């Protein structure tokens, strides 16, 4: 899959949605395309998740997502007060669980890494294209009073991907 963007391109949200042919509303989008997944990250001050960049941008550490606010058990429910979920109450995998399982299959069983296309929010409506990454690891960390998912992604040397890469 070729992309019309180059790493570091500054784009509008509309450009992002046109490129992906969908209106992206959530940060983690597992297998949104046959040949890749998408994550939307933010390093902005006051960003809701502790995403970070290492090794001059070649490694991303992406934090998983909280329980949706609509799942609250009452007024004042704080999603940051509970562990990030892997699955819903019915046992269906949520995005955290899908990405986690894919990373573990790669790390522990040498399955091909999930290819992930990464966009970074610069400010409202303005994004940066960060390129294609391989999802190479995942784990849970203690964060104050709860557990959060962490996902390690490595920048792909090959930025033009095809199904044969997958």
Model-derived regions, located:
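Polar low-complexity intrinsically disordered regions
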Residues: 1-2, 164
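Acidic, glycine-rich low-complexity segments with interspersed aromatic residues
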Residues: 2-128
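Compact mixed alphabeta submodule
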Residues: 122-166
């Amino acid at each position: 899959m070729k992309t019309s963007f180059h790493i570091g391109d500054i784009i509008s949200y509309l450009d992002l949605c046109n490129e992906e042919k969908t209106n992206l509303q959530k940060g983690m989008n597992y297998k949104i395309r046959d040949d890749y997944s998408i994550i939307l990250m933010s390093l902005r001050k006051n960003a809701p998740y502790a995403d970070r960049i290492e090794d001059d941008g070649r490694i991303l550490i992406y934090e998983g997502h909280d329980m949706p606010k609509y799942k609250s058990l009452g007024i004042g429910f704080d999603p940051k007060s509970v562990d990030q979920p892997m699955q819903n109450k019915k046992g269906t995998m949520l995005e955290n669980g899908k990405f986690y399982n894919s990373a573990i299959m790669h790390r522990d069983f040498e399955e091909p890494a999930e290819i992930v296309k990464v966009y970074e929010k610069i400010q409202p409506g303005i994004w940066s294209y960060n390129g294609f990454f391989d999802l190479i690891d995942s784990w849970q960390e203690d964060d104050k009073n709860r557990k959060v998912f962490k996902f390690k992604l490595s920048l792909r040397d090959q930025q033009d991907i095809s199904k044969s890469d997958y």
